[in-house]
Amino acid sequence: MATISLTAAQSLGPLKVIIYDCDGVLIDSRRSNAAFYNHILERFALPPLSPRQLDFVHTSTAQEAIDHLFQGTPWRAEAQEYQRVMDNRPFLSLLRLEPHIRETLGALRPAYHTAIATNRGKSLPLVLKELGLQALFDLTVSSYEVEHPKPHPECLLKILQHFQVAPAEAIYIGDAPVDLMVSRRAGVTFGAYKNPELDAGFHLQDHLDLLKILPGGAAR
């Protein structure tokens, strides 16, 4: 169920843009990410990801993840080059859509603009195509399209500028502390997905819950 205070709900509107993180919000990608980075680690004869390492790479850019995994080794630069050129497609079959996200996006549009702000890089278009989500977003901003990835607010600010809206006219839905941080830095209300520990403006356990708390129905 959705959990949101009446005061917080009233302060949301009127909204024009709904922005989503990708991994952990639109898609369950932990198995895919684990397989991707374990493949790279195996290539350099390193042990597979620990649970803590998986948590780190799950919210990082690929470059940040490789820097972290290969720190203290002589293969960091070589591993960076390998991840830049390797084919992501073998790992796409491990992705799963989060429940009801397609229905929610369909209900939001066209009343609201929809966008993605993510630290996922070159693989984002492949992911959206694989899962049939391309037509459900007006704008996507990956780590390849900003100079400073999250937690810098550039990705959200770029979306606000594109739609010519104020921070109060958008919300950002994420699942990790870095998403909360970037929302605060951009002045955008943050909604936490399946993470009740985050100090968010509202919490969602199911994407359909968003439709129950948006002010003014589908008016934009």
Identify what each model region corresponds to.
Residues 48, 64-65, 77, 93, ...:
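Secondary-structure transition/capping residues
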Residues 29-30, 94, 117, 126, ...:
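Alpha-helix N-cap/helix-start motif
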Residues 47, 72-73, 111-112, 134-135, ...:
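Secondary-structure boundary/capping positions in well-ordered alpha/beta enzyme cores
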Residues 2-106, 110:
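N-terminal helical cap/lid subdomain that shapes the substrate entry/recognition surface
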Residues 1-16, 106, 121, 126-220:
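Asp-based, Mg2+/Mn2+-dependent phosphohydrolase catalytic module
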Residues 19-21, 117, 173:
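Generic enzyme active-site microenvironment
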Residues 113-115, 189:
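Proline-centered loop/turn at the N-terminus of a beta-strand
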